[in-house]
Amino acid sequence: MDFDTLVIGAGAAGMMCAAHTGGRVLIVDHAKAPGEKIRISGGGRCNFTNMHCDPAAFISENPHFAKSALARYTQWDFIDLVDRHAIPWHEKTLGQLFCDTSAKDIIAMLRGLMQSAGAELLLSTEVSALKQTAGGFSFELNGTRRLTARRVVIATGGKSIPKMGATGYAYDVAPQFGHRVTPTEPALVPFTFPDRRFADISGVACPARITANGTSFDEAMLFTHRGLSGPAILQVSSYWAAGDPITVHLAPDTELGTVL
């Protein structure tokens, strides 16, 4: 075997895996640089974790997965890792943690961890073929180089932000090896309307309580030329399905009597 582990995708999950899995590791990505979504996250400062990270905050068909995953590696473990690498950070609203300077600090930290572990990183590289063999997997890089690995980790992420190179690679490859892929729906997205009913107040933000299917979020809401956005809308979009009503309360903490 050429490698013990092949990791496909050099995002946050892929780099953490390559840094900690041990043995001979090859990590590949079709992008020109690793961690591209990290680089743009949090407005360029990377909202790398949350003080209040809890299994109940995750949406999953299998709630126990979030419990077991977070029990094995908590937000405090990652905060400790960031502190050990002397990356300054600060807390914003609702326990959100951001780098003081740049998301590039997190990328550099993860690259350093991979290098220390001896993982080999190949960029601008596509896995053009992947097959299971008796002893592991054989794969082809950029249609020419053929190698083998005992294990394969698919860490290419979802289809979000296609302009940055995101594809449905994982959804196409995983079923080849017997995995069931759950159909996906857009999440953490704004609500848009066919008309431009809020165009005159586009750019106006206000606190609001947004409710869908019994789940509410009290955060900022933003009127846009196409509809509604902002933290509250993005959060509740994960709980909404087509045809469901949405309740927007613009004065959730105000007694009606005091206004009248």
Give the location of each predicted region:
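Residues at the starts of beta-strands that form the adenosine-phosphate
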Residues: 4, 24, 120, 180, ...
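General beta-strand structural signal in soluble alpha/beta enzymes
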Residues: 27-29, 91, 121-123, 154, ...
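Glycine-rich loop(s) and the adjacent beta-strand/alpha-helix scaffold that form part
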Residues: 151-197
